[in-house]
Each structure stands twice: as C-alpha cells, then as structure tokens.
C-alpha cells in the first residue's frame, strides 16, 4: 500500500462565517478530512500486540482442528441407552498430542484425556467418575446423549472464516486467538509517528531546577505516554522557546521525522503565541474555536504536508482535547478508523447547573455505583487528572444535574487508557 499524499494547507479550513464549532461538528470535520497516512508491513503474530491490522485476518485452520474430548473419561460411539451397560475396554488411550491410531467399534470404549482427539468411530465421552472398571469391561449406567462431553471440529473457529477485520487494534487475547487459528504472520500498518512539542519560555523539564516564575512541563511526559499506550511511535522534540525562529525550526525537524505533530502551548492568538502565528504565516493554520470546556481554542494546521494539532498549554485542557479530538484523529491516520469512546449511562452523585452553549467535560470517577466529580472544575488543578477514572460529558444545551440523575460517563478505559 502506497503512502497517501501530504495534506494541503487548507485541509482544516472552516466554512466562511463559522466562529464557534460544536464538538460534534468538529469531530465530523476531522473524520471527513483525514485519512490513513501510514504504509503496510508484515508482522509476526508473537510481536503484533498493539498493532493495527491492515487486512482482515482469516483462520488458517479450524479450531479445534478435529473432534476432541472436553473431559477426562472414556470415548465411545453413539451415546448410551437408559440402564446399566457393559462395554469392552480397548487397550491404550488417546491423549493430547498422542491420538489413538485404531478404530473404535460400537460396544467398545477407550480411555481419553481432556483435549485429546476422539478416536475414529467415537463421538461421545463419559466422565471417568461415572464409570467402574472390572477386568477389561467398562461398567456404566445410561442414558447419555450422543455427542456429550465432546467438542466438534471447528466449533470455535472454522478454517477460512474471518476472525478480525482490517482496522482492528490487536490485544494480547487476540494474539492467542490468531495463534490458535494457525496464523504465524499478519499484515499491519506501520506505527504512526507522532512528534510532540512543548512551547513556552516558562517551561522547565521535569527534574530541572526552576524559579518560582517557571513551571515544569507536565504536558510532554503525559502526552508521550498516552501516545505510546495507543501503539504510536513517539518523536520527542522537547521544549521549544517562545520565538518564531525556534518554533519554525522545531516544526521542520518534526515534519521530517513524523507523520503528525502535536504541540501544546501557543495555540491561541496572544502576543507570545508563536506556534499559531508561525502556522498562520505559512497559510496552513485554522484556529478552531470549539464550544468545549476545558480546551478552547484548538489550532489545526499543516506544516510541510504534515498535520499539526495545537493543543492548549493547560495540562487539563490538553489532556481532555487529546482524548476527545486527537485520539480519533490519530487512530484515523494510523489505520484504525475514527472511533468514539464507549459511554456508560450511570447515576450522578453530584449537583451542577450548566449553561447552554458548549459541551463540558468534568473529571470524574465511579464510586458505589454512582459518578462523583472532582471538587474543583478549575483547569489549573492538575491533580484531578489522576484522581479521576474518566470524564463526565455534559451536553451542549443547558442542564440541571442532581444526584441520582442519569449522566454520561466516559471511563479512561474507553479511550484506551488504564
């Protein structure tokens, strides 16, 4: 698969006259304007965890590949009629990986272990605790339905059946399924390369000395970790000073090494917001004033044909925008398709009066079957991100929330995070 052409500078331009964009419309525009931007490569099943399938996966053989026993017991043919019966016990046994080579005739039984192939002529297994052995005879009392305690060939997966569709992001359990289906290699998309840039003269790297008028760069470690959990390859550009020349140089380095660029800070239109100014000067920036709290504005641009997501500098707003907007866009670029989080509709354990006009996301967690929210809605309270287990999504319209009312809870797990 060839790599798609680079984006045009006007890729993210909004229609004339649009000033405030609803969240749903912003997501729709992103889905429309972005496409998969990575090539395809083969990958061993053992190494495919987290990779995104470029082609559907077809079972190479049935599972189980032959009829086998679900229990330890004795194989026989055709089930048992009611009443006490005596069957000839054949010498030998059938064990997993050591199938019995002979033929089992009606009226005969053979020792069989769990997972072992049923011998030719057998279709039923009687539990070992339900029989008695006397000399070379098996004493058993029926009835027993034909096919009991036996697994049919292919009852789990049939050879030639589709087991995963293209775009599926593989999980550890999926690797077990593919191995069981006889697959050794699958076709996957190459990992999306995402460059991460933090801007701001006030920023210091974690662990460095900092004056009281400086702050530590919380966004870059957080965003890099999130991206790795989503199976993407991180290109860490570092902290960039607040001047146009440094920003241009950082964008050049990022565009050379990555498929997409994520920046935090400088996305607004202030005197020191050089990221948006540089993108605007190149003709490839659209400032999306999205009706969302926290998180506005979101700068979307193109640099050297590479899409740029300009996140707010505030860590809470940056995190929320990453989950709500960047994640579905990045998954689309990575080949997994545009995805929405799975919402849980649960009772609220809080009260709130919300004004109309924008969608709101509150840091929240589930306790005793109800959803509670962080004590402060202030986006400066970074600790609330770790306190929370997800986000409450409040609709664009005005709302009065009271305890017990059903609300929409988006757990972090629905965004691919623990």
Where are these regions (language model features)?
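Residue-level signal for inorganic ion chemistry
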Residues: 30, 73, 160, 196, ...
């Amino acid at each position: 698969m060839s790599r798609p052409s680079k984006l045009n500078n006007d890729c993210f331009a909004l229609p004339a006259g649009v000033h405030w964009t609803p969240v749903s419309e912003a997501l729709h525009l992103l889905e429309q304007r972005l496409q998969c931007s990575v090539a395809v490569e083969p990958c061993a099943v053992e190494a495919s965890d987290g990779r995104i399938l470029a082609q559907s996966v077809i079972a190479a053989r049935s599972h189980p590949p032959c009829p086998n026993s679900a229990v330890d017991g004795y194989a026989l043919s055709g089930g048992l009629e009611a009443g006490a019966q005596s069957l000839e016990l054949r010498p030998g046994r059938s064990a997993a990986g050591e199938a019995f080579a002979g033929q089992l005739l009606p009226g005969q039984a053979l020792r069989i272990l769990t997972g072992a192939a049923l011998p030719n002529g057998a279709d039923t297994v009687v539990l070992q605790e339900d029989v008695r052995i006397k000399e070379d005879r098996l004493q058993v009392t029926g009835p027993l339905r034909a096919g009991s305690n036996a697994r049919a060939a292919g009852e789990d997966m049939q050879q030639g059946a589709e087991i995963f569709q293209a775009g599926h992001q593989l999980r550890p359990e999926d690797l077990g399924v593919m191995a069981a289906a006889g697959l050794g290699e699958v076709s996957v998309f190459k990992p999306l390369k995402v460059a991460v840039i933090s801007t701001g003269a006030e920023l210091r790297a974690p662990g460095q000395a900092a004056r009281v008028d400086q702050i530590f760069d919380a966004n870059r470690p957080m965003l890099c970790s999130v991206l790795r959990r989503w199976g993407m390859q991180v290109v860490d550009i570092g902290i960039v000073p607040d001047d146009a020349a440094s920003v241009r140089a950082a964008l050049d380095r990022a565009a050379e090494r990555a498929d997409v660029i994520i920046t935090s800070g400088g996305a607004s239109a202030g005197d020191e917001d050089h990221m948006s100014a540089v993108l605007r000067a190149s003709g490839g920036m659209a400032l999306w004033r999205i009706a969302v709290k926290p998180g506005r504005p979101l700068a979307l641009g193109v640099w050297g044909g590479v899409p740029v997501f300009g996140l707010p500098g505030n860590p809470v707003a940056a995190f929320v925008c990453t989950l709500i907007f960047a994640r579905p866009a990045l998954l689309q670029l990575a080949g997994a398709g545009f995805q929405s989080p799975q919402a849980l509709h649960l009772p609220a354990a809080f009260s709130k009066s919300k004004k109309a006009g924008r969608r709101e996301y509150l840091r929240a967690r589930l306790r005793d079957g109800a959803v509670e929210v962080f004590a402060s809605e202030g986006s400066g309270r970074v600790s609330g991100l770790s306190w929370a287990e997800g986000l409450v999504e409040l609709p664009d319209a005005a709302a009065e929330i009271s305890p017990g009312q059903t609300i929409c809870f988006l757990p972090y797990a629905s965004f691919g995070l623990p």
